[in-house]
């Protein structure tokens, strides 16, 4: 046969004599060797390139999406978050339903229920952010935190809401499919209420605009995300991210929301003080468990925004016992961390029980909840951490109550000369 009359593969140039099969298409041919090669390439999962900001398009399968039961979710949260039993149970159920919904969608099943976005109420340092972080760690999904006070509506100087999605995409190493089932936590959400007290009229207007802008990505939209962040401009390339299955958790202190609830319920009919300013913390926590959509609207959130959160739960102010437990019980408890740091220097760090309660009392007075604990301990132990590495005679350090309350020096136990030798 004349070589010129032989049919060849359009990709590799092999002739029909050199291959087992040659499949014809419109004016083209492909051999079995090239088909196998292409099949192998398609079977490989694409790798992301975060440094260049190039998105990957891997489609997630149900097999790599963890869907733990509510009890399992709460059990994991308990390892890191002290107290907040009601909040942890409520969130565990909401998160379970959310990811169960995603798994059903991945399996091409019809789903009639919507996503379970969560709104967390509660004072600073009550564990709102920690709960969200822990959830992301448990579920092994991308996670990012945003501050609502830095966001602005279009036309204002500040950060566009799409940049929140960009940060989630970056947390997912630009894997779009992973980002599309991640978790976004927006803190200080109460600060963008349109009628909140002590805020300028300009900020109220801007706050409502931010709520409107957030509404779109929270309810589910295809966001055009600038790969490098910043403001959008014409002729710019975008990464398209569908936010329909991203779990949004928002949190805020919502100061004085309890008074709005009391006014709705009728303060004299629910067993509280006649003076709205006289509520104890226990009263406030109890009132916040009765929050309704109308209370949040009265606070300054727009109805459409509140309507996107079908799970609204209160994180209570931490008690003295809970603050002590936070110091010592969680897997990553801060006292455990300092004990380990000192043990690296071959020094035993001992906290007496009264000292732990003194630290908790000091944190309580700071009005910032668990956040104050780390600062108190850092200030307490900083000088010791400076001196200890240069002093091999120190065997143990005992922190007592008067060390905290009266600024007395901790008890230092020294090694004998023989032990040092």
Swiss-Prot record:
ATP-dependent specificity component of the Clp protease. It directs the protease to specific substrates. Can perform chaperone functions in the absence of ClpP. Zn(2+) binds at residues 9, 12, 31, 34. The gene is clpX. ATP binds at residues 123-130. HAMAP family: ClpX. This is ATP-dependent Clp protease ATP-binding subunit ClpX. Gene3D superfamilies: 1.10.8.60, ClpX chaperone, C4-type zinc finger domain, P-loop containing nucleotide triphosphate hydrolases. It comes from Chlamydia caviae (strain ATCC VR-813 / DSM 19441 / 03DC25 / GPIC) (Chlamydophila caviae). One of its GO terms (cellular component) is HslUV protease complex. InterPro entries: AAA+_ATPase, ATP-dep_Clp_protease_ClpX, ATPase_AAA_core, Clp_ATPase_C, Clp_protease_ATP-bd_su_ClpX, ClpX_bact, P-loop_NTPase, Znf_CppX_C4. One of its GO terms (biological process) is cell division. Keywords: ATP-binding, Chaperone, Metal-binding, Nucleotide-binding, Zinc. Residues 1-50 form the ClpX-type ZB domain. Component of the ClpX-ClpP complex. Forms a hexameric ring that, in the presence of ATP, binds to fourteen ClpP subunits assembled into a disk-like structure with a central cavity, resembling the structure of eukaryotic proteasomes. It comes from the Bacteria. One of its GO terms (molecular function) is protein dimerization activity. Belongs to the ClpX chaperone family.
């Amino acid at each position: 046969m004349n070589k010129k009359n032989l049919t060849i593969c359009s990709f590799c140039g092999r002739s029909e004599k050199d291959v087992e099969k040659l499949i014809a298409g419109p004016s083209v041919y492909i051999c079995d060797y090239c088909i196998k090669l292409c099949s192998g390439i398609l079977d490989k999962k694409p790798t992301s390139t975060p440094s260049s900001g190039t998105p990957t398009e891997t489609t997630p399968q149900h097999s790599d999406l963890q869907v733990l039961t509510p009890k399992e979710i709460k059990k994991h949260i308990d390892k890191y978050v002290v107290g907040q039993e009601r909040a942890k149970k409520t969130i565990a159920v909401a998160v379970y339903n959310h990811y169960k919904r995603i798994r059903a969608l991945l399996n091409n099943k019809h789903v009639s229920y919507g996503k379970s976005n969560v709104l967390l109420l509660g004072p600073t340092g009550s564990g709102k952010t920690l709960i969200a972080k822990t959830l992301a760690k448990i579920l092994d999904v991308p996670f990012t935190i945003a501050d609502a006070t830095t966001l602005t509506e279009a036309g204002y100087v500040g950060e566009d809401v799409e940049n929140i999605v960009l940060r989630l995409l970056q947390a997912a190493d630009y894997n779009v499919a992973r980002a599309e089932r991640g978790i976004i936590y927006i803190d200080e959400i109460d600060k963008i209420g349109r009628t909140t007290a002590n805020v300028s009229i300009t900020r109220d207007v801007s706050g409502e605009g931010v709520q409107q802008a957030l509404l779109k990505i929270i309810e589910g939209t295809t966001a055009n995300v600038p790969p490098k962040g910043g403001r959008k401009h014409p002729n710019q390339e975008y990464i398209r991210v569908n936010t329909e299955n991203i779990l949004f958790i928002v949190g805020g202190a919502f100061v004085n929301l309890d008074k709005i609830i009391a006014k709705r319920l009728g303060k004299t009919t629910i067993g509280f003080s006649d003076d709205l300013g006289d509520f104890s913390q226990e009263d406030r926590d109890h009132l916040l468990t009765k929050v309704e959509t109308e209370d949040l609207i009265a606070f300054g959130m727009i109805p459409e925004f509140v309507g996107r959160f079908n799970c609204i739960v209160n994180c209570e102010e931490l008690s003295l016992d809970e603050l002590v437990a936070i110091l010592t019980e969680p897997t990553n408890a801060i006292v455990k961390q300092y004990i380990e740091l000192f043990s690296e220097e071959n020094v035993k760090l001992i906290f007496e029980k009264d000292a732990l309660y003194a630290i908790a009392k000091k944190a309580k007075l700071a009005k910032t909840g668990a956040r104050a604990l780390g600062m108190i301990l850092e200030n307490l132990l900083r000088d010791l951490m400076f001196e200890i590495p240069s002093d091999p005679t120190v065997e143990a350090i005992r922190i007592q109550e008067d060390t905290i309350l009266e600024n007395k020096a901790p008890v230092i136990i020294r090694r004998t000369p023989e032990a040092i030798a």
